[in-house]
Amino acid sequence: MALQVLSPMPGRVANLTEVPDPMFAEAMLGPGLAIDPPRGPVVAVAPVSGTLASLFPHAMGIESDGYSVLVHLGLETVQLNGEGFTVLKAKGDTVVAGEPIIEWDPSVIEAGGLPVITPLIAIQAEASQITQLVADGTVVEAGTPVFEVA
């Protein structure tokens, strides 16, 4: 059964090759896409229903139906030590797709010199398992289905 993955935030859908980090751009962690968020306060929501297997101020990993989905808010944002991010849930929580998980402000992160493009990855999946549901360049709202993994 295919797992539908939602955009964790509003923004422009981008190919992973646009992400200026080879770990994501070369799909080393798995296939997916990226979201270039609007500047200003943004709420990152759960892209799938499941268990928050990992949760950091700058990232979330959700286990769902045997799949693991990663949202990484911006790049190299771990060095901010949580500054500019507000975590709304706890590791181990069960969440529903579309539920708010982390509040952040991409404009603050960008002002600090860090990229805000946000990879959305199906961890350790194969590219052949992914069906992208919206074209690169499409502007989506949080909660819009963007790909399926099967």
Positions of PLM-derived features:
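Contiguous, well-folded functional domains in the mature portion of proteins
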Residues: 1-150
